[in-house]
Amino acid sequence: MNIETINITNYRYFKHYEASFCPKANVLIGRNGTGKTTLIHAIIKALSFIFSNDKSLGKDFLSAGNNTLNVKSYNTSDFHFNQETREYSSEASIKATGIFYEQQLNWELFKRNTPKSALYTSLYKDAFTSFMTSAKSENSEWPILAYYSDSYPHVYSRINKSVLDVINQDIIPRNFGYYQWDDESACTSLWEARLCNRIAKMQPLYTPAARVASAIYEKEESLTQKELQADADYQKLKEEDNRLTETMKPLYNEVNYIEQKLTSFISHLPKVQAEGFDIDYFFATQSEEGYKLTINFKNGSSSLLQDLPAGYRRLFSIAIDIAYRSYILNQSVESSGVVVIDEIDLHLHPALEQVVLNAFMETFPQLQFFVSTHSVSVISNLDTSKTSTDGADKRENQILVMNIGEEQPQVLPNLLGVDYNAVLRDFMDTPSRNEELKNLEDLYYSYLSMDLKNESQTIYNQILALVGKDAKVLETIQNKAKEYEVH
């Protein structure tokens, strides 16, 4: 599933806004106050139509048994506020188009700003019916939907008893893969508890499995095939081996899927590998608060997930969250769907900013990503020249610039390999540090040549603030300044 277009009317920051999206990566950039957060929340709200439980739409719902799933309606503060008239809009609308199982979906979430008003279900009924028909067909995949706020994963959601009971089940309800999918807080502790539970159940099985395998091997080495068939002890050993295998298989498959996804993700992050954070294996560590996920790395070190550096912890947590949702929804099948990451560059070293988006795209190749960023490293390392392989002449990735007062974003040209300073200057409306320094130098020399001592000192102080008092460039500036001083 992916979302192709959105058309917003009277929602929060926007009087009107519309945008078209690419199937792989959509990077949102722009200064604060341009509406990036509003657009992100509009996308999330639009996608929630699949969780309708309105009885007028039928009897079969994805939300069945999970009261956290529903269509996201509009709150009073969601209606656009006109600062000139000091009035809220009388209605709000988010229209969207998308594709699920090659079916074109068109829907609208519309609500009037009156007491007790509700969403007009008729405006998303056809899309919902089409979606559910595909979703409920035999062997169908369900799309991943996930949102990661700029506070993720540092604000945890509480795990109450009912949720704990669910994650401790051997077989989890399929729609639990959508649990708190759009929440500001993190489900990391939830998946961590689940993963540790699986690991803890596996660990006691290794010793008897190894013992049985050894006994089977000894008999097979010493007896003929005919003797083995007549050997009652051998038959019992084979039965026990099958029992242990069947018990361990679902546990192993689940743990291995998450482990392999995180391993794959790290393989696309050279800096993480260079620092020795290649995963060797997971294990569960007992603490006063219960089991905690410990990661053993190939360099011999180990760390609790929660004790990793902030940037690594966020990336690992997002990768684990996506992987777990995918596994619960579709087992080991590569899932499609939509993932939204606010401030993808948060807490990251520049070397990681350059590759983080591509790492997510390579690890989860069927997903459509929406990410916001202020990092020039992110946008200048995304190849937006690639086109779809399905024959359609459509770009897979794009960078969208949002500006104040505009009703749609600007699509940037391919910036892959473009000089960072040029990107800052020409496309992010931000002067590079080098350019800013040059402008200050020129002004400083001009004031010196006019013998404006106070003004020149003020500019020099700004240079100090920009480069630091120990910067080598200061010596060059001081030497050149002598040529401009009035004697």
Where are the predicted features?
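P-loop NTPase switch/coupling surface
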Residues: 1-225, 443, 468, 472-487
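Switch/communication elements of ASCE P-loop NTPase nucleotide-binding domains
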Residues: 1-63, 287-432
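Acidic, Mg2+-coordinating catalytic modules of nucleic-acid enzymes
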Residues: 22, 137-140, 394, 408-487
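Phosphate/oxyanion-binding loops and surfaces in catalytic or ligand/nucleic-acid-binding neighborhoods
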Residues: 46-50, 151-155, 265-272, 385, ...
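Hydrophobic, Leu/Ile/Phe/Ala-enriched alpha-helical segments that form helix-helix packing faces
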Residues: 47, 96-98, 127-136, 255-273, ...
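Short linear motifs in intrinsically disordered
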Residues: 74-89, 273-287, 383-393, 435
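Soluble or luminal CAZymes and related metallo-dependent hydrolases
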Residues: 123, 127, 250-258, 314, ...
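Extended helical coiled-coil dimerization/tether regions that scaffold
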Residues: 181-313, 317-334
